[in-house]
A protein has these predicted regions:
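ATP-dependent carboxylate-amine ligase
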Residues: 1-7, 213-223, 227-237, 241-409
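Phosphate-binding loop of NTP-binding sites
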Residues: 2-160, 164-175, 215-218, 271-272
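Acidic, Mg2+-coordinating active-site environments of NTP-dependent enzymes
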Residues: 26-28, 96, 119-250, 340-346, ...
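Short, conserved phosphate/pyrophosphate- and ester-handling motifs at nucleotide-, phospho-/glycolipid
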Residues: 40, 207, 253-257
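Residue-level detection of beta-strand-connecting loop/turn positions
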Residues: 54, 69-70, 192, 247, ...
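Generic beta-sheet signal
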Residues: 60, 159, 180-182, 279, ...
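Short, small-residue-rich loop/turn micro-motifs
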Residues: 61-64, 192, 380-382
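Amphipathic alpha-helical transducer elements in NTP-driven molecular machines
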Residues: 80-87, 143, 205-208, 258, ...
């Protein structure tokens, strides 16, 4: 009942916002990107390609909004801003003479009507995996909500290798659908469209294919796309290797779902000569069923794991860690106290520690665990600028926490 009331509020608010700003979402060519994982990178990839092809384009993503070359903060823990912010940005984009805007879209924003009164030229769906089931209640509901973007768009672009594809195919509307993939017979594949990219991992191959599909549909030439993909260096907090004067690597990534772990951890492991050290937690008041899965996947790929906080809000951080630890144990990981780290380093099995304070966890990983040729990967916070404890948002920077930890090492 509460959720329905909230959705009605947003639906009315979305109309009022669109009306007040002159319905800019009906006058721009808007490319929307949704999906559980990969939507931020895909959003920025499309923007980079269009910009490199000299198109007048702006973007709104979970990292920032860039309207007419000016960057704006989109807030704490935000992927899709509220309807008033979105309409304001669209109006600024239109007034600046833009033809296109690339918009990252969440399932929450679609379900709550925050994207109403926006005509999407193209809707891109990256994948639909285990996430947000606390909100959507079932995978089928989650898929149906994501599909709203495809059905609102003139052209829908979908990943035919994803588990959601059979459902989407069975329920597709009359609009045009274009597919991309690696394993199945898609419209766009690496064999049909040859390209190179500095981005690591198979998951970024999928992100690139999605961007290729979208940009081909708006008239960017194949050669322009290929050249742009070569020059895209990635974005903040997405498998970002931190420059530091140490003999081990540090990577910051936003991965916070089981599927994302299955993508980024093997990629990090493949590029690590020594041990892979994984520092992570799980956000509170979200889908609890993913926590044990994340612990198991981490133990499958990481050698040393530091379980810590990630926006524990009004839950007990130690109970969240307990739930993650069950997955670690299930994969044969052994638990050690932090003062036993020297003994733990000799273990041939995966090892995990509990360090509830994230700052202390990063210090422990950098100062005690990491040695030559190791890799530390910090997941879950990335670009976010706050850490929620209780009901208070405390200022937080993953990058600054790493910098300060290295100063003391």
């Amino acid at each position: 009942m509460w959720q329905s009331t909230k959705n009605v509020y947003h639906a009315v608010s979305a109309f009022l916002a669109a009306f007040c700003y002159g319905f800019p979402g009906k006058k721009l060519k808007i490319i929307g990107i949704t999906g559980t994982d990969g939507k931020t990178t895909t959003t920025h990839l499309i923007h980079h390609i269009l910009n490199s092809a000299h198109k007048k384009v702006s973007l709104i993503s979970s990292v920032y909004a860039q309207i007419a070359g000016v960057k704006y903060d989109t807030g704490f823990h935000v992927t899709s801003p509220n309807e008033w912010q979105v309409q304001k940005f669209l109006r600024q984009s239109l007034d600046s003479g833009d033809e296109y805007i690339v918009l990252e879209v969440t399932s929450h924003a679609l379900d709550q009507h925050r994207m109403d009164w926006i005509d999407f030229e193209i809707g891109v769906l990256t994948n639909i995996t285990h996430e947000h089931l606390d909100y959507h209640k079932s995978y089928a509901n989650y898929v149906s909500t994501k599909e709203k973007l495809l059905n609102q768009a003139r052209i829908g672009i979908v990943n035919c290798d994803d588990d959601s594809f059979s459902f989407l195919e069975a329920n597709s509307k009359e609009n045009q659908r274009i597919t991309y993939g690696i394993k199945n017979n898609a419209d766009i594949t690496p064999e049909k469209f040859h390209f190179t990219s500095p981005l690591p991992g198979e998951y970024n191959l999928y992100n690139s294919l999605a961007a290729i599909c979208a940009c081909l549909q708006v008239g960017v030439s194949a050669e322009e796309i290929r050249q742009s993909l070569k020059t895209f260096k990635g974005i903040k907090g997405r498998f970002e290797k931190i420059a530091a004067d140490v003999d081990f690597d540090i990577i910051i990534d936003f991965a916070h779902t089981p599927h994302a772990f299955e993508e980024v951890l093997p990629t990090a492991k493949k590029n690590t000569q020594g041990k892979l050290i994984h520092v992570f937690g799980s956000a509170a008041l979200r889908d609890q069923s993913k926590r044990q899965l994340m612990g198991a996947i981490s133990a499958r790929f990481a050698d040393l794991i530091v379980l810590t906080e990630e926006d524990y809000r009004t839950e007990d951080v130690n109970e969240i860690i307990d739930q993650i630890a069950k997955g670690c144990f299930a994969e044969g990981a052994k638990e050690y106290a932090t003062n036993e780290y020297k003994l733990a380093l000799k273990s041939t099995s995966p090892v995990f520690f509990r360090v509830p304070d994230r700052k202390s966890a990063i210090e422990f990983a950098t100062q005690k665990l990491a040695h030559k040729d190791d890799t530390i990967i910090l997941t879950g916070k990335a670009h976010e600028k706050s850490l929620c404890r209780g009901v208070i948002e405390y200022p937080w920077s993953e990058h600054l926490a790493v910098k300060n930890a290295l100063k003391r090492s």
